[in-house]
């Protein structure tokens, strides 16, 4: 499948990912974006077949305002964004695609558990990254103490985090800046955005030692940019 990761911080940290391929509405396209997206998929498949690629992976492209696609790199492994692709994937009409399991299966020399013809997508997935950077200070990395971190559970929501939910957490100076990934599913882009904002509104984040304001700034940044998501 495809996903769009155009909304990033100045440090090139991806902040919002959308599947299938979408784009910020602030970009005014003068080309057929659906055609370009189809071409990108066709090019990627052709390259994979040409070199005999047999693994999970991501072909990363950048598209100019004229609609010219350029291949940037191939990540020959699973990526942290795999969850937003998996949440919209359906195999034989059923949910439950596990891309990490497929990565292991191919590494063992086993065939994939399904064929391309058996794969379809349903709905829209949005992934938010809560990152230890301060959007109000040029996305400068920050450390501090998180006193409380919680949200309202929902059947359309998955939150992955290493931050403890039952006791405070001190962000160290040597750390993975990704504090949490939130994956939201909706039947269409409008529902996905509505649910995404509902999740952000439900977040309870309290911090001390400088962590409080950056935490709130992160949520405000994600809220502001949720409105910029628009399907090709």
Language model features with spans:
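ATP-dependent carboxylate activation and anion-phosphoryl transfer catalytic cores
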Residues: 1-232
């Amino acid at each position: 499948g495809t996903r769009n990761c155009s909304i990033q911080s100045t440090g090139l940290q991806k902040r919002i990912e959308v599947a299938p391929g979408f784009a910020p509405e602030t970009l005014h396209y003068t080309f057929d974006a659906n055609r370009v997206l189809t071409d990108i998929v066709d090019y990627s498949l052709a390259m994979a077949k040409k070199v005999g690629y047999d693994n999970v992976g991501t072909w990363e492209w950048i598209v100019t305002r004229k609609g010219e696609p350029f291949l940037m790199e191939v990540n020959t492994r699973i990526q942290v964004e795999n969850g937003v692709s998996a949440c919209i994937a359906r195999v034989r009409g059923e949910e439950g695609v596990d891309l990490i399991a497929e990565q292991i299966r191919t590494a063992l020399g086993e065939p994939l558990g399904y064929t391309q013809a058996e794969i379809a997508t349903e709905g829209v997935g949005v992934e938010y990254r809560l990152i230890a950077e301060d959007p109000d200070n040029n996305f400068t990395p920050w450390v501090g103490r998180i006193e409380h971190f919680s949200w309202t559970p929902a059947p359309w929501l998955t939150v992955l985090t290493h931050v403890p939910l039952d006791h405070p957490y001190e962000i160290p100076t040597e750390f993975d800046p990704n504090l949490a990934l939130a994956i939201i599913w909706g039947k269409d882009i409008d529902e996905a955005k509505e649910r995404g904002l509902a999740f952000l509104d439900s977040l309870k984040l309290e911090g001390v030692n400088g962590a409080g304001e950056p935490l709130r700034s992160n949520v405000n940044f994600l809220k502001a940019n949720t409105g910029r998501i628009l399907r090709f």
